[in-house]
Amino acid sequence: TRNTGSARGCLKVEIIEGRDLDVASQTLSHPYAVLQFEKNEYIGKHVSKAAVGSNPAWNETAAFDVTMENRSLHLSVYDRIGDTEELIGACEIFPRLFHQSTTKRWYTLYLLKEDAEEQVKRGEVHIQTTYERLPLRKLSPRDFELLKLIGRGTFGRVFQVRKKDTKRIYA
């Protein structure tokens, strides 16, 4: 599959909750999720009383442009206590990229032990993915919100912009 440069669709990922996460402290740990899809990243930094301990409730949503087929979504969950962060575990998700398809399920997090080649189960995360195919069209300046001027030169001006539908920031 080749990259056409324009979005074929939009993948919405809801990070609902975690279950039995292997955290360092039930009262001090603030686990959060990081999603990576097609070189774009979402870092869940939502801190609430419900996102503490081994069974956090996040209820966060990220949106990604889909430009290529057969891409995986990488999920990592980290344990934050104060200024320290440690990887709890990760998994690879292969979302269904069919128009108006929604999948809601629990995904198991694994961590590779340093001294062995075995993966250790480190908890589960409840994820919902929804895919919407977009009509084929070229992006225009109206699809973006100007944030600030970054640079100026013989090449023209470079702006920092936010894509209106996914809220992603680009330069």
Model regions and ranges:
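C2-type phospholipid-binding modules
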Residues: 68-135
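Long, low-complexity intrinsically disordered regulatory regions
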Residues: 1-8, 14, 117-119
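Exposed aromatic-hydrophobic patches
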Residues: 56-66
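Glycine-rich ATP phosphate-binding loop
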Residues: 157-171
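Calcium-regulated, polybasic anionic-phospholipid
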Residues: 8-54, 81
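Intrinsically disordered, low-complexity regions enriched in proline, serine, glycine
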Residues: 22-26, 43-47, 73-76, 84-87, ...
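Protein kinase glycine-rich loop
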Residues: 146-158
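A short, low-complexity linker immediately N-terminal to eukaryotic Hanks-type protein kinase catalytic domains
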Residues: 131-146
